[in-house]
Amino acid sequence: MTLYSEHVVVLRTWKLGEADRIISMFGARSGKIRAVAKGVRRTKTKFGARLEPISYVNVQCWKGRELDIVTQAESIELFPGIKGDLERLRKGLAMVEVIEELVAEGGADFEIFRLLVRALKRLEEGDSPYLLSGYLWRLLQVEGMAPQLTECVECGKEGEGLGVFSAAAGGMICAEHGGGVPISAEAVSVIGWMCEGELGRALSLPDSGLRHEVEGLAVSQIEGLLNRKVRALHLGAF
C-alpha cells in the first residue's frame, strides 16, 4: 500500500462496525476521498474529533483497494465559531453536503477545494447575508452547471421579456414558454456576479428581500440537480 498526505475538508462520516468510521473528505490534490478511521468510536480522542464534518485537517492515509485508511490527522482549522452557532453550523453543513452529493468522485479540482475553504473561513469570521448563496452559485459555475442568464434557454431570445427563471430548464425563459418563477433584474445581476466569482460585490450588499430571492433560487437549482432537498438547509428556518 502507498502512504500519502493530503490537506482535506471533512464532508461526512458514517459508522462502520462497532468502533470504526468511514470518512468522506475533499482533498486539495485528490478531490473526493473515502477512508476508514479505525477505532475512533471506541474512545473520545483528538484523532476522532479532528475527523468530524467541517474540519480542515492534514491527513495521512494508506491507499487501499476500495477504502483508504486514515493513520493520522493534524488540525489546520476546526472552525469552532461555526460549530458553536446553530445558524452558521447549518450553513457550514450545507456547504459540505452539497459537495458530497453534487461533485463526482475521482479527479482533483483545486478550485472547488479553495472555494470551500475560503467560504468556511469567511463563515468562521462571521456570517454574511450573501455568503451561502454566493458559494452555491459559484460552485455551480465551477461544476459547469451555472444557469443561462442572458437569453431564453428554450428559444435563445435575448433582451426584454426575460423575467422568469426556471431551475428545471436551467436558466431564464421568455414569456412564450410556461413554468418558472418571476425573478427581478437585481437578482439576475447578483447571481451573475456570484457565478463569475465576484463574491466581494455581493458580500458587501445589505440584507434585504433580494438576499432571500437569490438564495432561494440557488437552493432550488441545487435541489433540482440533486433531485432531493439539501438536508442541512432544512434543519432550521430558511
Describe the function of each predicted region.
Residues M1-I22, F26-F238:
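Non-catalytic alpha-helical scaffolds and adjoining flexible linkers that form interface surfaces
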